[in-house]
Regions:
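N-terminal hydrophobic targeting/anchoring segments and the immediately downstream early-domain regions
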Residues: 1-161, 216-248
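Active-site core of metal-dependent hydrolases
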Residues: 144-225, 237-244
Length: 248
C-alpha cells in the first residue's frame, strides 16, 4: 500500500481514526469463496484497512437484480454467511460489532470493528420479518432503495421519481427505529429521502454521497436533504467516486 499512503498519512489516520461508512467488500469475499479462495479478508482487505487507519467499516451487502424477487434473501444470506465466516477466521484482527460499546471495545483491543448493512431492501420481501431476523444477525444499517424503485420507496436513478416512501416503507422506518437499525438515504430519490427524514424519529444518514450544489448528479444530495440529515443528528459520508465529484 506504499504507493497510496506515506508514513505521515498512516500516522494521521491512526490519530484521528477512520470510519468507512460504506464498503462493498462482502461481494468480493463471496465471489472469491465461489472461486475457492477462503482467505481474501485476511490476504487482501485487512491489510488495506490497517494501512488506511480504518477502525470501523460498514460492510454493505448488496443483492444484484438477477436474484429478484425470489432469491434476493437467499443471496443476502450467502453474502452474510461468507462474510461472517471470514470474520470468525480472523477474530484476532476484526470483529462484528452490534453496539457502540462493541465498537469501542473492539477498537481498544486494536481490532477493526465491522457493522453490517443492507444496500437495497429487496431481500426483505413483502413484510418485515426478515428485517427482524437480520437485525438479530447483526444488521445495523439499511438502504430502503438502491437506484431503482422498490416496494419500500423510489431510488435516485428512476426517471419518474414521484411517489416517495411507500406505506410498507413507512412501517419499515418505524421498525428500524424500534430495533436500532439506521436508515441510509444514499440511493433514495429526493422525495423518498425527504419522506424518510420526516418519518424517522432517529438520526438518518447518507453513508456515501456528496453535495449536489458542487456536482449536479442524482446520486448527490440537495442542500435541503443535507441540512435535514444534520438536524436529525445524522452524518453524510463523502464518496470518492470521480463522477460524483466532477464532470471532468
Amino acid at each position: 500500500m506504499a504507493e497510496y499512503f506515506t508514513a505521515a498519512d498512516a500516522e494521521l489516520t491512526r490519530r484521528i481514526g477512520i470510519v468507512n461508512l460504506h464498503d462493498d467488500f462482502p461481494a468480493a469475499i463471496l465471489k472469491q469463496r465461489f472461486d475457492g479462495v477462503y482467505d481474501s479478508l485476511r490476504a487482501y482487505w485487512l491489510p488495506r484497512f490497517r494501512a488506511g487507519g480504518v477502525g470501523v467499516v460498514v460492510a454493505a451487502v448488496f443483492t444484484p437484480s438477477i436474484y429478484f424477487p425470489d432469491a434476493a434473501l437467499r443471496h443476502a444470506v450467502w453474502s452474510l454467511d461468507a462474510l461472517l465466516a471470514e470474520i470468525d477466521d480472523n477474530r484476532n484482527d476484526i470483529e462484528l460489532a452490534r453496539s457502540v460499546a462493541d465498537v469501542e471495545r473492539i477498537n481498544r483491543q486494536g481490532k477493526v470493528a465491522v457493522l453490517l448493512a443492507l444496500e437495497g431492501a429487496e431481500p426483505l420481501g413483502q413484510d418485515l420479518s426478515a428485517l427482524r431476523l437480520l437485525h438479530r444477525l447483526g444488521l445495523r444499517m439499511l438502504s430502503l432503495t438502491w437506484a431503482r424503485r422498490t416496494l419500500f420507496g423510489v431510488g435516485d436513478w428512476e426517471h419518474d421519481d414521484r411517489g416517495g416512501l411507500t406505506a410498507i416503507g413507512r412501517r419499515a422506518v418505524a421498525e428500524m427505529n424500534r430495533l436500532g437499525v439506521v436508515v441510509d438515504v444514499s440511493h433514495a430519490s429526493d422525495e423518498t429521502a425527504r419522506d424518510i427524514l420526516e418519518a424517522s424519529a432517529k438520526p438518518v444518514i447518507a453513508s456515501h454521497a456528496n453535495a449536489r450544489a458542487l456536482r449536479n448528479h442524482p446520486r448527490n444530495l440537495t442542500d435541503e436533504v443535507i441540512r435535514a440529515i444534520a438536524s436529525s443528528g445524522g452524518v453524510v459520508g463523502a464518496v470518492a467516486v470521480a463522477n460524483f465529484i466532477s464532470e471532468e
